[in-house]
């Protein structure tokens, strides 16, 4: 019994319990690949994916997940144990994974607007050309050249 008591005490200490922060109040650390915004280290709060650090969108109430981002030096970011650790963004990764859907929606919207504009200009040009085709028709042009109007005949007399 005396041997089990220290083991039970270790299990009951909140600093030694790991979990995902999903709400029972006794969890103090986030699982690997996630971070917590709240301070001090024993505080309880939501866990966020590491991909959300320096993503241009503040997820923490105080914006600490965006602190030190975009500098030439290695930025310091909050970790699950409250200390700050340097991080280097992954090379060639401009947008976080959660924004790729928005990016494709934006690209699709811009392309659709361009297609509608080009189609509208083409339809307008076609209608203008159709309305001018009777003015420049071969039959009316040859008739005007062969039989001058009275007004044109008066000019020569």
UniProtKB/Swiss-Prot annotation:
Topological domain ranges for the Extracellular compartment: 20-102
Keyword flag Disulfide bond: yes
Disulfide cysteine pairs (residue numbers): 30-47, 37-60, 54-69
Function: Responsible for susceptibility to the retrovirus subgroup A Rous sarcoma virus.
Cytoplasmic side: 126-157
Chain positions carrying an annotated carbohydrate: 20, 24, 81
Signal peptide: 1-19
Record-given protein name: Subgroup A Rous sarcoma virus receptor pg950
Lineage: Eukaryota, Metazoa, Chordata, Craniata, Vertebrata
Keywords for the protein's UniProt record, in alphabetical order: Disulfide bond, Glycoprotein, Host-virus interaction, Membrane, Receptor, Signal, Transmembrane, Transmembrane helix
Localisation per UniProt entry: Membrane
Annotated LDL-receptor class A domain residues: 28-71
Species this protein is from: Coturnix japonica (Japanese quail)
CDD domains per record: LDLa
InterPro entries assigned: LDL_receptor-like_sf, LDrepeatLR_classA_rpt
Membrane topology field: Single-pass type I membrane protein
Listed Pfam families: Ldl_recept_a (PF00057)
GO cellular component: membrane
Organism superkingdom: Eukaryota
Membrane-crossing residue ranges in chain numbering: 103-125
């Amino acid at each position: 019994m005396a041997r089990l008591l220290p083991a039970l005490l270790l299990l009951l200490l909140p600093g030694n319990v790991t979990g995902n922060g999903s709400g029972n109040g006794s969890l103090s650390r986030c699982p690997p690949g996630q971070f917590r915004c709240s301070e001090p280290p024993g505080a309880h709060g939501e866990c966020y994916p590491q991909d959300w650090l320096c993503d241009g969108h503040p997820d923490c109430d105080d914006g600490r997940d965006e602190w030190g981002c975009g500098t030439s030096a290695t930025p310091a970011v909050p970790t699950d144990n409250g200390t700050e650790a340097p991080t280097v963004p992954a090379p060639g990764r401009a947008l976080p994974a959660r924004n790729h859907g928005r990016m494709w929606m934006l690209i699709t919207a811009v392309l659709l607007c361009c297609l509608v504009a080009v189609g509208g200009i083409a339809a307008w040009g076609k209608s203008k050309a159709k309305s001018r085709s009777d003015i420049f028709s071969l039959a009316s042009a040859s008739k005007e050249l062969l039989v001058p109007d009275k007004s044109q005949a008066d000019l020569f007399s």
